[in-house]
Amino acid sequence: IHALQDQYSQKMPFTFLMPAAEAIYHPYDFRFVYEQKQIELDEAFFSARKEYKNDEYRNISQERIVDRDARFMDAGKMAAFVEENFSDCWNVVALRNAQYYQTQILEQQSEFGGMRLVFEEEKLVCIYAYAKEEGLEIREPLYLEGKEDLFWASVDGLREPEEKVSVYGLKEAPDWPDDETSAYKEKPLIMIRIVHLQEL
Protein backbone atom coordinates (compact mmCIF):
# COMPACT_ATOMS: atom_id res chain seq x y z
CA ILE A 1 0.00 0.00 0.00
CA HIS A 2 2.80 2.45 0.92
CA ALA A 3 4.47 1.85 -2.44
CA LEU A 4 1.23 2.71 -4.26
CA GLN A 5 0.83 5.86 -2.16
CA ASP A 6 4.39 6.91 -3.03
CA GLN A 7 3.73 6.29 -6.72
CA TYR A 8 0.49 8.28 -6.53
CA SER A 9 2.32 11.25 -4.97
CA GLN A 10 4.84 11.04 -7.84
CA LYS A 11 1.90 11.08 -10.31
CA MET A 12 2.90 7.79 -11.88
CA PRO A 13 0.06 6.78 -14.23
CA PHE A 14 0.33 3.03 -13.58
CA THR A 15 2.51 0.34 -12.07
CA PHE A 16 3.15 -3.25 -13.07
CA LEU A 17 4.68 -6.43 -11.67
CA MET A 18 5.25 -10.13 -12.21
CA PRO A 19 3.17 -11.67 -9.43
CA ALA A 20 4.17 -14.63 -7.31
CA ALA A 21 0.44 -15.44 -7.20
CA GLU A 22 -2.57 -13.65 -8.67
CA ALA A 23 -4.53 -13.98 -5.41
CA ILE A 24 -2.07 -11.71 -3.59
CA TYR A 25 -2.53 -8.73 -5.92
CA HIS A 26 -6.08 -9.11 -7.25
CA PRO A 27 -7.67 -7.53 -4.11
CA TYR A 28 -5.50 -4.44 -4.75
CA ASP A 29 -6.97 -4.01 -8.27
CA PHE A 30 -4.05 -5.49 -10.18
CA ARG A 31 -5.13 -7.25 -13.39
CA PHE A 32 -3.29 -9.36 -15.94
CA VAL A 33 -2.51 -7.54 -19.18
CA TYR A 34 0.06 -9.85 -20.77
CA GLU A 35 0.15 -13.57 -21.41
CA GLN A 36 3.49 -15.02 -22.43
CA LYS A 37 3.52 -17.75 -25.05
CA GLN A 38 5.70 -20.67 -23.99
CA ILE A 39 6.74 -23.94 -25.58
CA GLU A 40 9.21 -26.72 -24.81
CA LEU A 41 10.87 -28.36 -27.81
CA ASP A 42 12.92 -31.54 -27.96
CA GLU A 43 15.17 -33.28 -30.45
CA ALA A 44 12.15 -34.47 -32.44
CA PHE A 45 11.21 -30.88 -33.32
CA PHE A 46 14.66 -29.97 -34.64
CA SER A 47 15.07 -33.30 -36.46
CA ALA A 48 11.65 -32.92 -38.06
CA ARG A 49 12.50 -29.38 -39.21
CA LYS A 50 15.72 -30.60 -40.80
CA GLU A 51 13.88 -33.45 -42.52
CA TYR A 52 10.97 -31.25 -43.59
CA LYS A 53 13.16 -28.42 -44.88
CA ASN A 54 16.04 -30.73 -46.00
CA ASP A 55 18.21 -28.87 -48.55
CA GLU A 56 16.69 -25.48 -47.69
CA TYR A 57 17.53 -25.95 -43.99
CA ARG A 58 21.07 -27.06 -44.76
CA ASN A 59 21.58 -24.03 -46.99
CA ILE A 60 20.39 -21.75 -44.18
CA SER A 61 22.65 -23.40 -41.64
CA GLN A 62 25.81 -23.40 -43.73
CA GLU A 63 25.66 -20.38 -46.01
CA ARG A 64 23.08 -17.70 -45.21
CA ILE A 65 23.14 -17.51 -41.44
CA VAL A 66 25.69 -15.58 -39.43
CA ASP A 67 24.91 -15.32 -35.74
CA ARG A 68 26.87 -14.17 -32.73
CA ASP A 69 26.46 -12.86 -29.22
CA ALA A 70 25.78 -9.14 -28.92
CA ARG A 71 28.45 -6.86 -27.47
CA PHE A 72 27.84 -3.64 -25.54
CA MET A 73 28.48 -1.59 -28.67
CA ASP A 74 25.62 -3.46 -30.43
CA ALA A 75 22.99 -2.15 -28.01
CA GLY A 76 22.14 0.90 -30.13
CA LYS A 77 21.78 -1.25 -33.26
CA MET A 78 19.45 -3.62 -31.37
CA ALA A 79 17.30 -0.75 -30.09
CA ALA A 80 17.00 0.69 -33.61
CA PHE A 81 16.09 -2.75 -35.01
CA VAL A 82 13.26 -3.17 -32.50
CA GLU A 83 12.00 0.41 -32.87
CA GLU A 84 11.93 0.19 -36.65
CA ASN A 85 10.33 -3.24 -36.95
CA PHE A 86 8.35 -4.01 -33.79
CA SER A 87 7.34 -0.79 -32.00
CA ASP A 88 3.76 -1.05 -33.34
CA CYS A 89 3.33 -4.57 -31.92
CA TRP A 90 2.78 -3.54 -28.29
CA ASN A 91 0.43 -1.24 -26.39
CA VAL A 92 2.57 -1.12 -23.24
CA VAL A 93 6.25 -1.98 -23.30
CA ALA A 94 9.48 -1.14 -21.50
CA LEU A 95 11.55 1.58 -23.16
CA ARG A 96 13.88 -0.44 -25.37
CA ASN A 97 16.80 1.91 -25.84
CA ALA A 98 20.52 1.15 -25.91
CA GLN A 99 20.70 1.18 -22.10
CA TYR A 100 17.89 -1.40 -21.92
CA TYR A 101 19.79 -3.77 -24.21
CA GLN A 102 23.08 -3.24 -22.37
CA THR A 103 21.25 -4.31 -19.21
CA GLN A 104 19.76 -7.31 -21.05
CA ILE A 105 23.22 -8.39 -22.22
CA LEU A 106 24.53 -8.33 -18.63
CA GLU A 107 21.46 -10.10 -17.23
CA GLN A 108 21.68 -12.91 -19.78
CA GLN A 109 25.43 -13.29 -19.25
CA SER A 110 24.76 -13.77 -15.53
CA GLU A 111 22.77 -16.87 -16.55
CA PHE A 112 25.55 -18.21 -18.82
CA GLY A 113 23.86 -16.82 -21.92
CA GLY A 114 23.66 -13.63 -23.92
CA MET A 115 21.73 -11.66 -26.49
CA ARG A 116 22.00 -13.34 -29.88
CA LEU A 117 22.11 -11.42 -33.15
CA VAL A 118 21.20 -13.18 -36.41
CA PHE A 119 22.29 -11.67 -39.73
CA GLU A 120 21.44 -12.50 -43.32
CA GLU A 121 23.86 -11.03 -45.84
CA GLU A 122 25.04 -8.55 -43.17
CA LYS A 123 21.48 -7.38 -42.42
CA LEU A 124 20.21 -7.88 -38.87
CA VAL A 125 17.06 -10.03 -39.14
CA CYS A 126 16.59 -11.43 -35.62
CA ILE A 127 17.53 -10.86 -32.00
CA TYR A 128 16.79 -13.03 -29.00
CA ALA A 129 17.95 -13.62 -25.46
CA TYR A 130 19.20 -16.99 -24.28
CA ALA A 131 20.29 -18.51 -20.98
CA LYS A 132 22.00 -21.82 -20.22
CA GLU A 133 21.84 -21.88 -16.44
CA GLU A 134 19.31 -24.74 -16.28
CA GLY A 135 19.09 -26.04 -19.82
CA LEU A 136 18.73 -23.84 -22.87
CA GLU A 137 16.09 -21.11 -22.58
CA ILE A 138 15.24 -18.78 -25.45
CA ARG A 139 13.51 -15.54 -24.48
CA GLU A 140 11.54 -13.05 -26.54
CA PRO A 141 12.71 -13.84 -30.06
CA LEU A 142 12.09 -10.98 -32.48
CA TYR A 143 12.60 -11.85 -36.14
CA LEU A 144 11.56 -10.20 -39.37
CA GLU A 145 8.70 -11.68 -41.36
CA GLY A 146 9.87 -14.68 -43.35
CA LYS A 147 13.01 -15.16 -41.23
CA GLU A 148 11.66 -17.79 -38.83
CA ASP A 149 13.90 -20.49 -40.33
CA LEU A 150 17.00 -18.40 -39.65
CA PHE A 151 15.93 -18.02 -36.03
CA TRP A 152 15.41 -21.78 -35.56
CA ALA A 153 18.70 -22.58 -37.30
CA SER A 154 20.46 -20.23 -34.87
CA VAL A 155 18.78 -21.88 -31.87
CA ASP A 156 19.71 -25.32 -33.22
CA GLY A 157 23.35 -24.18 -33.33
CA LEU A 158 23.26 -23.18 -29.64
CA ARG A 159 21.78 -26.35 -28.22
CA GLU A 160 23.56 -29.54 -27.24
CA PRO A 161 22.53 -32.80 -28.97
CA GLU A 162 19.29 -34.17 -27.48
CA GLU A 163 18.90 -31.02 -25.34
CA LYS A 164 15.37 -29.73 -24.75
CA VAL A 165 14.80 -26.06 -25.46
CA SER A 166 12.29 -23.86 -23.62
CA VAL A 167 11.12 -20.87 -25.66
CA TYR A 168 9.37 -17.90 -24.02
CA GLY A 169 7.65 -15.04 -25.81
CA LEU A 170 7.11 -16.49 -29.29
CA LYS A 171 4.66 -14.48 -31.39
CA GLU A 172 2.98 -17.68 -32.61
CA ALA A 173 3.38 -21.45 -32.47
CA PRO A 174 6.27 -22.66 -34.61
CA ASP A 175 5.72 -24.15 -38.04
CA TRP A 176 5.82 -27.82 -37.10
CA PRO A 177 5.64 -30.46 -39.84
CA ASP A 178 3.55 -32.85 -37.74
CA ASP A 179 1.41 -30.02 -36.37
CA GLU A 180 2.20 -31.15 -32.82
CA THR A 181 1.76 -27.95 -30.86
CA SER A 182 0.28 -29.43 -27.69
CA ALA A 183 3.26 -28.17 -25.67
CA TYR A 184 2.44 -24.61 -26.75
CA LYS A 185 0.71 -22.64 -24.00
CA GLU A 186 0.02 -19.13 -22.83
CA LYS A 187 0.85 -18.18 -19.25
CA PRO A 188 -0.44 -14.96 -17.60
CA LEU A 189 2.70 -13.05 -16.65
CA ILE A 190 2.33 -9.30 -16.11
CA MET A 191 -0.22 -7.55 -13.88
CA ILE A 192 -0.91 -3.84 -14.03
CA ARG A 193 -2.76 -1.33 -11.86
CA ILE A 194 -3.76 2.25 -12.58
CA VAL A 195 -2.22 4.52 -9.94
CA HIS A 196 -2.93 8.10 -11.01
CA LEU A 197 -5.83 8.16 -13.47
CA GLN A 198 -5.46 11.85 -14.37
CA GLU A 199 -1.96 11.17 -15.72
CA LEU A 200 -3.15 8.61 -18.28
Say what each PLM segment does.
Residues Q5-Y8, D67-R68, R116-E122, G169, ...:
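Functionally constrained cores in energy, signaling, and assembly domains
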Residues A23:
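Cytosolic ligand/metal-binding cores
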Residues Y28-K53, R139-D149, A153-L200:
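Active-site/acyl-donor-binding loops of N-acyltransferases
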